[in-house]
Amino acid sequence: MPKRPTAGKVKQGITFFLAGIMGDTQRLQTISTKNREIARTVACNSRPIEWGQPPVLTGGSSLIKIELLAQNNHELVFTSVVHRIDFDLLKQSFRKIRKSESAGVDKVTAKEYAENLDQNLYNLYERLRRGQYVASPVKRIWIDKEGGEKRPIGIPVLEDKIVQKAAAAILNVIFDRNFYNFSHAFRKGRSQHMAIKDLREQCLKQNISWIVSADITGLFDNINHELLKDMIRRRVSDGGMIRLIGKWLNAGVMEEGNLTYSETGTPQGGVISPVLSNIFLHSVVSG
């Protein structure tokens, strides 16, 4: 391993990178023990709905409760969250996903699904509640790029998009407060423009004289499944949620009738892939 530079302009550049890490680490250590125990009790005492009950309508209040707990208790481990994916959250998720995209391997379009939306979502909700939900393979197609090259595109089936959107909403409210301030990708209220603005401000404040531009090649395709699940368990120790994520990770890819599987990578085109990649990268940086 190369030695870390210790002098001159390079040292100033390293200080800039570590500034966000050190600041956020100190923030994570200010949690009140009393508040942590209260929140832990609330989370552990949450229970799934009983069989035979009608679809639960929460109006998003479940996510608000989870977010408040996560805000005030950055080390809290949530043990029961998968049941928050109820009928109402599924319906909200359907409204938020892009409707213009192509159909997946089941050939069901958003327009067709919406013709009997409540019944379709109720059936989906029942399969989730009974543990009968099965993730479908992602359909892979290739599109042209400049220069004559082609790029693979993954198209999940509509129901997988809906459930992934709901699960991603839960994971985001739990993990987002832990992410570093210098992390901008796929986060609500953040953008490339904000990243550039923050970088400029840090450069002016700390007299930064150099910047490294780097890209992680094939990030989504090379995330180790077991490591990812271990990282998620640090905040979400819910077997139901972990199994649900595992179904998407192991669903495989369908290309021209051939089904293939991989032990690495998040779902191609998956709505949940961005938050999974953020969790993974945050854990790598944190150590």
PLM region spans:
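Non-catalytic, polymerase-adjacent accessory regions of viral genome-replication enzymes
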Residues: 1-107, 111-118
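Short alpha-helical scaffolding segments that buttress acidic/His motifs in well-ordered protein cores
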Residues: 93-97, 166, 244-249
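Duplex nucleic acid-engaging cores and interfaces of nucleic-acid transaction enzymes
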Residues: 158-168, 210, 229
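Conserved aromatic-histidine-acidic binding/catalytic patches
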Residues: 82, 112, 155, 159, ...
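Conserved polymerase palm-domain catalytic core
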Residues: 127-142, 146-147, 178-190, 194-287
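Amphipathic alpha-helical blocks
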Residues: 112-135
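Electropositive, glycine- and tryptophan-enriched low-complexity nucleic-acid-binding patches
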Residues: 164-165, 169-184
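Glycine-rich active-site/cofactor-binding loop and its immediate structural neighborhood
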Residues: 145-156, 160-165
